[in-house]
Amino acid sequence: MRNDLICLGVITSSHGISGHVKIRTFTESPEDFTSYGMLTDGTNTYKISIVSVISQNIIIAKIKNIVSRNDADLLRNKKLFIEKDKLPNLTNNDEFYHNDLIGLNVILENNKVYGNIKKIHNFGSCDIIEICLSNSKKSTMLPFTKNIFPYINIKEKYIIINLPETIGNSSDT
């Protein structure tokens, strides 16, 4: 997959009999999902229009040339991407795209490397950062809050972590 692509959502299922699909969006607002133009899965491009917004991150959409439930079922679990340069420029230092965080070094407040960011999840209530620990093959997941991650430096490729006492500092062992 190209490095300049940002995942905006994933098709989770078909919806109805006329080829509509249910899409889990990763945009700040679900209405923004189609604002940036045609989307791609890395091979094909799709012209998508929103039929309805179901929840904070679920939409029902129509994809051009998908006309039946069978057609829509073939797209299940397909990730949809946009070229990063089609997204708006971020002007606030506290704003960034999730994709920019993947691979950042996670640094403890004592300047020791704790690990690096493997993935960002959202199971409903908030974003969760998955960190590959530097001293093992294990990983840990922590809520992505300003209290736990007080400082992010995208240009220098690191993020500071303030570990909750219940987690402890496993990199000291």
UniProtKB/Swiss-Prot annotation:
Protein name (database record): Ribosome maturation factor RimM
Tree of life domain: Bacteria
Free-text function comment from the UniProt entry: An accessory protein needed during the final step in the assembly of 30S ribosomal subunit, possibly for assembly of the head region. Essential for efficient processing of 16S rRNA. May be needed both before and after RbfA during the maturation of 16S rRNA. It has affinity for free ribosomal 30S subunits but not for 70S ribosomes.
Annotated organism of origin: Ehrlichia canis (strain Jake)
Locations listed in the record: Cytoplasm
Predominant location: cytoplasm
Record carries keyword Cytoplasm: yes
Description of how the protein assembles with itself and partners: Binds ribosomal protein uS19.
Written domain comment of the UniProt record: The PRC barrel domain binds ribosomal protein uS19.
NCBIfam families assigned: 16S_RimM (TIGR02273), PRK14592.1 (NF011186)
Ranges for domain PRC barrel: 93-167
Gene: rimM
KW Chaperone (keyword) present: yes
Record family assignment: Belongs to the RimM family.
GO molecular function terms attached to this record: ribosome binding
